[in-house]
Amino acid sequence: MPLRLDIKRKFAQRSERVKSVDLHPTEPWILASLYSGTVCIWNYQTQTITKSFEVTELPVRSAKFIPRKQWVVAGADDMYIRVYNYNTMDKVKVFEAHSDYIRCVAVHPTLPYVLSSSDDMLIKLWDWENGWACTQIFEGHSHYVMQVVFNPKDTNTFASASLDRTIKIWNLGSPDPNFTLDAHQKGVNCVDYFTGGDKPYLITGSDDHTAKVWDYQTKSCVQTLDGHTHNVSAVCFHPELPIIITGSEDGTVRIWHATTYRLENTLNYGLERVWAIGYIKSSRRVVIGYDEGTIMVKLGREIPVASMDSSGKIIWAKHNEIQTANIKSIGAGYEATDGERLPLSVKELGTCDLYPQSLKHNPNGRFVVVCGDGEYIIYTALAWRNRSFGSGLEFVWSSEGECAVRESSSKIKIFSKNFQERKSIRPTFSAEKIFGGTLLAMCSNDFICFYDWAECRLIQQIDVTVKNLYWAESGDLVAIASDTSFYILKYNRELVSSHFDSGRPTDEEGVEDAFEVLHENDERVRTGIWVGDCFIYNNSSWKLNYCVGGEVTTMYHLDRPMYLLGYIANQSRVYLVDKEFNVIGYTLLLSLIEYKTLVMRGDLDRANQILPTIPKEQHNNVAHFLESRGMIEDALEIATDPDYKFDLAIQLGRLEIAKEIAEEVQSESKWKQLGELAMSSGKLQLAEDCMKYAMDLSGLLLLYSSLGDAEGVSKLACLAKEQGKNNVAFLCLFTLGRLEDCLQLLVESNRIPEAALMARSYLPSKVSEIVALWREDLSKVNPKAAESLADPEEYSNLFEDWQVALSVEANTAETRGVYTAAENYPSHADKPSITLVEAFRNLQVEAEESLENGNIDHEVAEENGHVENEGDEEEQQEEEVNEEEGVVDADSTDGAVLVNGSEVLTPHP
């Protein structure tokens, strides 16, 4: 049966001819050396070029990363080896290495060594800790040495491939080869070692169009791989999968089974001849170099083949080797830390006759099924004995221990608990996947159909593209995961049972309302498990989340890809495994899950009984959950974090609680936030206290001016000046009518030009003094400009109404300290504004006109004997009052100006 590997192209980039490729172990980088003389580093995640080195004008036939030094080493046809720092782009070393083209460079995995092979038929060893000195030369080949590669199982030895048709095995301590393999009928282009621990194999590729697998201990050919129609230019044993990859000048890459040597797949991306294949350990990515560019593919899934039963026993597969570990073997004395790798004792359980692609315990943990290569085998979990086997693409367990096998897209078999075939189904559609659990599910590309296990009756068809399916242990809830989101559905078991008991016919879409969609979440689920009514999963961003009642909580941010194994209730821990089979645990309290579940069901009494069992450090988590359910009052009672509790109190308008928290925390931002809420709520005394604590001087100015609190404004002016808040201090002083202090503040703030303009507007008598200061200050930077400043005392003709302004200042000086009560504002609000200079001038004009008219009328009155002395006296008294208060005649189009709550005359600038 075929290996059935998923092959996905992850990177494609056209370029000049690619002669070698390499993958970085930690960065998402592909290193490609080109025939044009350039070495490029591509980022396969962003699909962009990250670095580029112009090495030479001749071909660079080999380049490799040296990650532990942040270097790239490259060998070219100009016979030089060059070393670059790929971070700084600096050239670290350049030296002439050979007397002919350099075909290959190989980096020792641990020691500071680099091997190079050349058309001069020599292999040389270079030590970078010894100034890149050549410490050894290996002679023996009689033609070009095309490739050298270190043995990963014994890094003191290496193999070389030559066009003299041989493979030679060398030891770093000896200039002579250990032995020679007469490998092919024509020149050998490439060689690679098998990285697994069980086979002493290497593979070679030749111009005779074949690749051969060799046992280097017996020095015999194990298998010849025929199929290419041109020279085989690149070969490799994949480090993670049981496959051999060969590339040829016929333009194809062929994938062979490493055990059966069966051809599994052939790739042809239409980029002409294949020259290089690159891979790294612990990755399923393979990069291929062609005449016209670079391709990277991902083979299979990176999810580790592992399963854990409810007791904490884990079984996993490393290639064909089966290993086991038990979490409970650590002991109760071990204090587990979240995110820390568990020190498990790993034991060899046995081997598997097929290459495992999936492994799963049955519900009671007694059996384990392994699937792969189109077959399945059921083993006993303890002794690893073969219990049953058969052909099948997929195998699933029911929640009761029955099982189903998908033999093809048109045939599914159901087996009893004793693994006896009970039923065979031929669905009316192409079944691409099956899932087990409470119901048997079959998927096409567009929908999923649920069937009961007993009689395979259709329960319901749901139109959704399904990637995975997770049943809760109760059988009442199911999570359906697609490529971009997941859905939580409720299975109405009683409704379905009553439907079938009634004998009513079932239509093609199944039982209506068999499933009810409870929640939908736009997150991609990588792996998931249920704990009660809580769905735990990790998403595409590698966050470990759990979902209760549609509310998603992030437990932890994972620092690398990890996959869920299961949950052990008596430890309140969820366990995950990474690609290296490291097991990691995280705390998830069962009491917390139960509490949230009861709240979702509306059973608050039982939830409150569980609350005391939840540790205090988790109460904020509970409070956030309650807030999301709209239970803000309850959240406020439970919350322990002062910041969060303060936000809840503000949200509820509980100002006293918020004040207590603010007093405890003494946070300026909290006082300010509380002050704004108190102001909007009419709690003016609290607002004042908050603004004082928060040093919100602008808010205090607004409050005091609104209240007409002159004393408060006066104190605020002093405080603002101390705090350096000159704008607030100026407004306070101006509001109080303390114009001299305003001028002084401007001068002290070195705002002398503004002080001069203010003096001209409000205190003309101070202009000369300020102008003198201005001249003195300006003369330091521009003497000519300083001389051009005009003093009104010297040039009064340049200042309109100067004498009038002085008179107005003298007449209004006494009124600046008088403040009209705020309650009288309505009687002053409608009066028009006018400059006091203009008002003063109007008064003078009216007085003159009144005087002239008054003399004529008096003479006429004397002649007629009708002198109305009484009326004249009243008018005179009214004029005197108006003159004292600075009020213009009500019949005039001009009016008084309100300054600081008092009617005063303001001079015109």
Curated annotation (Swiss-Prot):
Official protein name in the record: Coatomer subunit beta'-3
Molecular function GO terms recorded: structural molecule activity
Membrane topology: Peripheral membrane protein
Keyword Cytoplasm attributed: yes
Subcellular location: Cytoplasm; Golgi apparatus membrane; Cytoplasmic vesicle, COPI-coated vesicle membrane
Family: Belongs to the WD repeat COPB2 family.
GO CC annotations, alphabetized: COPI-coated vesicle membrane; Golgi membrane; membrane coat
Ranges of the WD repeats in the UniProt entry: 13-52, 55-94, 97-136, 140-180, 183-224, 227-266, 269-309, 351-390, 461-501
Gene3D superfamilies found in the cross-reference section: 1.25.40.470, YVTN repeat-like/Quinoprotein amine dehydrogenase
Subunit note: Oligomeric complex that consists of at least the alpha, beta, beta', gamma, delta, epsilon and zeta subunits.
Function according to Swiss-Prot or TrEMBL: The coatomer is a cytosolic protein complex that binds to dilysine motifs and reversibly associates with Golgi non-clathrin-coated vesicles, which further mediate biosynthetic protein transport from the ER, via the Golgi up to the trans Golgi network. Coatomer complex is required for budding from Golgi membranes, and is essential for the retrograde Golgi-to-ER transport of dilysine-tagged proteins.
Segments for region (Disordered): 862-909
Disulfide cysteine pairs (residue numbers): none
Species of provenance: Arabidopsis thaliana (Mouse-ear cress)
CDD domains: Coatomer_WDAD_beta-like (cd22947), WD40 (cd00200)
PANTHER family: COATOMER (PTHR19876), COATOMER SUBUNIT BETA'-3 (PTHR19876:SF75)
Segments of skewed composition (Acidic residues): 870-892
